[in-house]
Amino acid sequence: YTLSLHDALPIYCAAYTNVDGCEVNHDAAFKANALGPRNLAQAAEKTGARLVHVSTDYVFSGRENGGVAQDEATIPGPISAYGSTKLMGEKYVEQFCHRHFIVRTAWLYSYYGKNFVKTIVNAGKKFGKLEVVNDQCGNPTNAVDLAHEILQLCVTHEYGLYHCTGEGICSWYDFASEIIRLSGVDAAVAPCTSEEYKAKHPESADRPKWSALDNRMLRCTVGNDVRDWRDALACFFAHWDGDNGMKD
């Protein structure tokens, strides 16, 4: 039995996002990142609903960049199980639901849940010194901005593939340094290479060194830019209440 959901708009945000865990838990990653979107896409098509599917910058290899951010026309080439299963999810959505928005985002953080910003703040408090890779570059994205742009996009009925990230490009080291500065935590952040990090953490999955995204289609469709990642991060800290989430 299926309810009539014509003009409903389910948003598939669920994912197995533990990049390292995906390398050893293939079935779990496939179920969450590929089969889940497929099942929802089939249900949406059957009931006449539209569908938003949130995907990732990790569908790209990041091996050949030339310093240019990747737009929606760039051909994916994932180098991890996480990226591969997320790309499969995209393909299923394209195949089974013709009224879809696939929205790739990157380096997402929020007031709630586990994310890089909270990890760096907590690690800085605990250890006082951090090593963060400086040769992997992308776009930090505030979840508030992602939600806002998805809402703006959905009223257009311009279905297809979109990139939605914070404006500006930085390395994980740059991101971590700004997090520590804005948080006021007394900690030092030192840069390291991906190879140096891998030597200390051999179980870690490969990650793209250049996964910067260009929001070209979003700009042309919605008509506005996402906030610069530094401005969005500063706003996050201005309204963050630690374990309580967002300030009232």
Say what each PLM segment does.
Residues 24, 31, 35-39, 46, ...:
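Catalytic helix-loop patch of NAD(P)-dependent Rossmann-fold dehydrogenases
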